[in-house]
Amino acid sequence: MNFEKIIAQNKLKTNAVLTTYCVIFAFIGLLVDVIRINANDLGIALFKLITFQIFPTITVIMFLVAFVVIVVCIQNFSSIMLSGDEYKLIDPSKVLSSKENQIHGLLLELLEEAKLNFEPKLYIINAPYMNAFASGWNETNSLIALTSALIERLDRDELKAVIAHELSHIRHNDIRLTMCVGILSNIMLLVANFSVYFFMGNRKNSGANLAKMILLVLQIVLPFLTLILQMYLSRTREYMADSGAAFLMHDSKPMIRALQKISNDYKENDYKEIDTNSTRSAAYLFNAEMFSTHPSIKNRIQSLSRRAL
């Protein structure tokens, strides 16, 4: 199976997960609206709320809050991702070291190969661990960050494959997707938890009581459901980025070697006390946690090895 077909299949999976998120998000808001209007019949109330015969106030507020939070995150996300470490912008208009010139040159080669008309900002993070991540809401404010240890220990092709992987995340809008899903998840959990307690003591009609019971069940189920969906979504995007890197490189071997070196580095060293920025853990090229949003290195390498260019 070629890489373009793999990417297309994973996009379909992503759309299915994102649709599921939006449906659950709206359903929770509608349930709270059913309780708010003290409905006698759950089905009839949901129909009237969905068709705006009754205005779904809580549902609309939830979507507005999500929108505001997303806007705030867009403005500050890159600075949050870079926080906690000393970092340097590779500015081609200034004098660069030979290594910085090489990294910038690799990025330009990939941009030409992919026929892209934008250039992400390139950062070096001064850190002893080997990793990389991409950030930015869209192409115009995107960035790619590489740790100094990664730059020192990978050869030219491996480094280019890592940059290609992060560039693929930007091309596939993965950062935007991850941010939106994370925000929707948190708002869903907050509304499901607090609405149950807020309405618990009030006398309600049968439809409202049924909505309350469903919310009580969701209060237990949602944390596990959102975790599973987020892990599935993120792992799908990682496979896509790996495929995108191999496609741009016309070879999967450099990406495989890079993953092996990074994995071995984390096996030999414990960086938990050094790398304290938890916000960017989901965006890393490699995540060593047991319940990681990333597939295992073994599965990623097997997936890359099976695929034909």
UniProtKB/Swiss-Prot annotation:
Its cofactor is Zn(2+). It comes from Helicobacter acinonychis (strain Sheeba). InterPro entries: HtpX_protease (IPR050083), Pept_M48_protease_HtpX (IPR022919), Peptidase_M48 (IPR001915). It comes from the Bacteria. GO terms for biological process: proteolysis. HAMAP family: Pept_M48_protease_HtpX. The lineage of its organism: Bacteria, Pseudomonadati, Campylobacterota, Epsilonproteobacteria, Campylobacterales. The chain crosses the membrane at residues 15-35, 54-74, 181-201, 213-233. This is Protease HtpX homolog. Its EC number is 3.4.24.-. It is an enzyme of class 3 (hydrolase). Zn(2+) binds at residues 165, 169, 238. The gene is htpX. Its main location: membrane. It is found in: Cell inner membrane.
